[in-house]
A protein has these predicted regions:
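Conserved catalytic/switch belt of AAA+ P-loop NTPases
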Residues: 6-20
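Conserved AAA+/SF3 P-loop NTPase catalytic/coupling segment centered on the Walker-B
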Residues: 1-9, 29-31
């Protein structure tokens, strides 16, 4: 609302002593011009996949080169996301479920896709994590056809279906319905 925006601008113009704001946005265009004019902009980008893979191998010496390259490609050079996928138990589970989901969607196995998603009907956070991982995998398959065994046509279906389900979940839609529709669209012939 307007009052909140004005209060934020006032604080940004005259911050309390010792206070520094760090604002992030995916695009400078997403920030209001009045706020942008009061900020110093720094553009940040992921590191190249080769550097990301090298950082992964340094952090996880037991990781083989191909897996490091694949993770770096999958997460587009985001070292933190790659390390999380390697070390966080919940992220590992979500990634494994997403890989299986993508495999079954590639085979157009509606039953197995639905069975996998049904396991998340009572756990919105885990469902969101699996769908996010599926969007990452689909995006990777669109950038490199055949990545993780997924072809571009299937990747496009997965991406559309997962994003629609994630939007429905954010809007507090019925989780069971969102996942059912998602599964039907992912495995469509």
């Amino acid at each position: 609302n307007g009052a909140s925006a004005n209060a934020m601008l006032k604080i940004m113009e005259e911050p309390p002593e010792g206070v520094m704001f760090l604002l992030t946005a995916s695009s400078a265009a997403a920030v209001l011009p009045t706020i942008r004019s009061r900020c110093a902009a720094y553009t940040m980008a992921p590191v190249p996949t080769e550097e990301c893979a090298a950082a992964l191998r340094t952090a996880q010496p037991e990781l083989n080169e191909q897996n490091a390259q694949d993770l770096a490609f999958l997460y587009e050079g985001h070292i933190g996301l790659c390390l999380k996928a390697l070390t966080d138990p919940a992220a590992k589970v979500a990634r494994a479920a997403a890989r299986e989901l993508c495999r079954q969607a590639q085979q157009q196995d509606t039953y197995r896709v639905q069975a996998l998603l049904a396991g998340y009907e009572k756990d919105k956070d885990s469902a969101a994590a699996v769908l996010w991982q599926a969007t990452q995998a689909a995006s990777a398959a669109l950038r490199r056809p055949g990545f993780d065994g997924v072809q571009p046509d299937t990747a496009a279906r997965i991406l559309r279906a997962a994003e629609a389900a994630r939007r429905a979940m954010k809007a507090n839609g019925n989780l069971r319905l969102a996942l059912t529709v998602c599964g039907m669209e992912m495995a469509a012939r």
